[in-house]
């Protein structure tokens, strides 16, 4: 993966060059991550939180142990798996990672249905609110940088439904 190699090289250079040069390597690293974010779940998870304060980020501080689960979701995305089952302790990040995967699918395929389910109304409500948070706080999450054509068009708190639509700009006359 050439783009991943570019990111590794940029990350390595960040620690070896002057602050001014480091800014350029950081921007190259960031653009490379954005390039992969619509296709690679790990890149998506990393990129959408880049503008959040480090202490508020979900994925970056947990990446070392979430990576196998993220790879499982990537295998589903790539068609290598039809079913992914996850067994991890409570509070390990399963639900939040699942929310991020549903958001990625909703952005990538806004004209298709995406389903997330859970046992109990409180859990389902937290899924709904978690998904919605990424779509309604663009100053904190970079979802629309990754999927600029995807737009939130409707929500239903009672039914816990979120509808996205593929937005195409009107053609000039």
Task: Label the model's feature ranges.
Residues 88, 162-163:
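Hydrophobic side chains in beta-strands
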Residues 87, 94-140:
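Conserved P-loop
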Residues 84:
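Conserved beta-strand position immediately N-terminal to the Walker
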Residues 78, 108, 152-154, 164:
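A generic structural signal for short, solvent-exposed coil/turn residues
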Residues 1-81:
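N-terminal accessory segments
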Residues 167-172:
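Conserved small/polar residues in nucleotide/adenosyl-binding loops
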Residues 139-162:
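Short mixed-charge
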